[in-house]
């Protein structure tokens, strides 16, 4: 019995502690990322943004948290109560579970699995289920139409993201996220794969329902989309899941194209900075790009969104996969692992 506890109990306890620490850190970072998003949007519109709760509004997200927690959860008449309440939980759990394989530094990862990129792709694909469950269970036409839009949108852009990932893994020669970062020591992949970087960034906006691709929650058409019937903690969980997913896509952009935790130049003093600092700086830089797109770019029409995904991104990404394979084989530079 003691041997079993030592063999399985201690490693499980360590993983549980690491997971708890990661979740707490993610929730804190998400609170301030949400505040930064609101501040950036306000600055673009020549406003101050949240500035009352705490110094410079730094405690605004926590005030919003308390406000949501103490409000009443209202379930619409005729709604499927079980699925209605399960939908936000599914969204949050899937968003958080994706971070289990994200390496913040060379050895700072909970599960350094060999198919990490495949795991992330699967988790991000499942995220649409929370939206569909919410739209169907609300027993209202606006959430239902929003769920249909979200399903079509996410499926459309998953295809392009898949081909982008194929280009990166062919160049790196591995599905392991740590190995992909290490393979960028000579050159970050956004330089040779610049078109794929642009496609991945724009597809990430569509995948996370960020403007200008927030068709699923377009206020002028669908009120608040699939969240229109939600209130209190359930609504807060949807917002939390959305921003954790955004941070996950920012982290994936950093790992696949921006060298992860690697410094821009491998000389002093750059290589003296801890890798996790470089990783977080790159993630926040990508999020800043997300926020600026939200502030400046108007929302696309639904037909424009579908046309961009199927008639522009899909052919370009497919062509780039063939081109990458041809270059690797033609110049005999296929990575050996």
Swiss-Prot record:
Topology in the lipid bilayer: Multi-pass membrane protein
Gene Ontology molecular function terms on file: NADH dehydrogenase activity; oxidoreductase activity, acting on NAD(P)H, quinone or similar compound as acceptor; quinone binding
Subcellular location: Cell inner membrane
Recorded catalytic activity of this chain's protein: a quinone + NADH + 5 H(+)(in) = a quinol + NAD(+) + 4 H(+)(out)
Pfam family, one: NADHdh
EC annotation from Swiss-Prot or TrEMBL: 7.1.1.-
Protein name per UniProt: NADH-quinone oxidoreductase subunit H
């Amino acid at each position: 019995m003691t041997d079993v506890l030592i063999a399985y109990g201690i490693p499980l306890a360590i993983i549980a502690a690491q997971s708890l620490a990661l979740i707490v850190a993610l929730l804190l970072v998400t609170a301030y990322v949400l505040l930064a998003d609101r501040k950036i949007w306000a600055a673009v519109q020549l406003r101050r943004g949240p500035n009352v709760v705490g110094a410079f509004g730094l405690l605004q997200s926590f005030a919003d948290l308390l406000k949501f927690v103490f409000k009443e959860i209202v379930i619409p008449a005729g709604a499927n109560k079980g699925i209605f309440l399960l939908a936000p939980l599914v969204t949050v759990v899937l968003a958080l579970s994706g971070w289990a394989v994200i390496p913040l530094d060379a050895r700072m990862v909970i599960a350094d699995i060999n198919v990490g990129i495949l795991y992330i792709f699967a988790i991000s694909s499942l995220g649409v289920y929370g939206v569909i469950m919410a739209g169907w269970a609300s027993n209202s036409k606006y959430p239902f139409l929003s769920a249909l839009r979200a399903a079509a949108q996410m499926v459309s852009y998953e295809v392009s993201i898949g081909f982008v990932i194929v280009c990166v893994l062919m160049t790196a020669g591995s599905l392991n996220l740590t190995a992909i970062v290490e393979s960028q020591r000579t050159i970050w992949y956004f330089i040779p794969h610049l078109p794929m970087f642009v496609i991945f960034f724009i597809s990430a906006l569509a995948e996370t329902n960020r403007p200008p691709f927030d068709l699923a929650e377009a206020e002028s058409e669908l009120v608040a989309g699939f969240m229109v019937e939600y209130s209190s903690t359930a609504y807060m969980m949807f917002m939390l899941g959305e921003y954790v997913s955004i941070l996950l896509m920012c982290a994936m952009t950093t790992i696949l194209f921006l060298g992860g935790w690697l410094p821009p130049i491998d000389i002093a003093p750059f290589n003296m900075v801890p890798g996790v600092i470089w990783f977080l700086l790159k993630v926040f830089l990508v999020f800043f790009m997300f926020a600026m797109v939200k502030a400046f770019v108007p929302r696309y029409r639904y037909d424009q969104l579908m046309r961009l995904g199927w008639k522009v991104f899909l052919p370009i990404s497919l062509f780039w996969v063939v081109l990458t394979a041809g270059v690797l084989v033609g110049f005999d530079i296929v990575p050996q692992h």
